[in-house]
Amino acid sequence: MSEISIATSVPSGPGPLIGNQPDGPAKVIVRDLNFYYGQNHALKHINLSLAANRVTAFIGPSGCGKSTLLRVFNRMYDLYPGQRAEGQVMLDGNNILDPKLDLNLLRARVGMVFQKPTPFPMTIYENIAFGIRLYEKISKSEMDGRVEKALRSAALWNEVKDKLNASGLSLSGGQQQRLCIARTIAVRPEVILFDEPCSALDPISTAKIEELIDELKEDYTIAIVTHNMQQAARVSESTAFMYLGELIEFGPTNKIFTSPNDRRTQDYITGRFG
């Protein structure tokens, strides 16, 4: 895809109460996005932008559409029949919903880390090298360097450098999740999607992942879905609150958590429903 300049504003029309937009240029702009599971209208007229090199958190009760939205960003829904998206999702000015789009290239540019760690049943080294080989042919020495760099970026190198030939499944839950992050980083994405990345982890592992996310935003644009309000407040610059497939409110995280404009946002954050 070509790199072209893009506007950073979100168009008017059906949509949420939107506060001040995040500082800096937008990496992703969503325009009047609708998504359907068969006849079920799961996402309704979504408009927002993801700022480059920032963390955007998506919060809301179960079934509100936040994970569905995340899966639109890398066309994961294409793997399942009967699902479709309408509207525009612009990545550096190119609509990723274009049916002619190369999905392998898109998923290299937009990586995803899932709720439960999903290491491949292979060695730690091969977990990282596998994805690189899908897109590039490089020498063994270059591969060694890429594997080390990815593991260092995921704050895992020092823990596994002496056992790279051990199974990825032999690692602890928190280490497995960081291995999955390293695997995502290894193919050099531009955007990383995190879908409840800490829900299966203990508090210590969660703290490591949160610290890692804060470091990763220097190089990547990040979107995270979380049910943990404290986590959203800690890691993100912008927060989107979703309810029943609609984007209710979107703006700076501090504003969303301290003085939201919509009563439903306030009620959810304070635990009155959800």
Curated annotation (Swiss-Prot):
Molecular function via GO: ATP binding; ATP hydrolysis activity; ATPase-coupled phosphate ion transmembrane transporter activity
Any one cellular-component term (Gene Ontology): plasma membrane
Regions of compositional bias (Polar residues) in chain numbering: 1-11
Keyword set includes Translocase: yes
Region of interest called Disordered, as start-end residue ranges on this chain: 1-21
Topology in the lipid bilayer: Peripheral membrane protein
Segments forming domain ABC transporter: 28-269
Residues reported to bind ATP: G60, P61, S62, G63, C64, G65, K66, S67
SUPFAM superfamilies recorded: P-loop containing nucleoside triphosphate hydrolases
InterPro entries, per the entry: AAA+_ATPase, ABC_transporter-like_ATP-bd, ABC_transporter-like_CS, P-loop_NTPase, PstB-like
Function recorded in the entry: Part of the ABC transporter complex PstSACB involved in phosphate import. Responsible for energy coupling to the transport system.
Quaternary context: The complex is composed of two ATP-binding proteins (PstB), two transmembrane proteins (PstC and PstA) and a solute-binding protein (PstS).
Record-given protein name: Phosphate import ATP-binding protein PstB
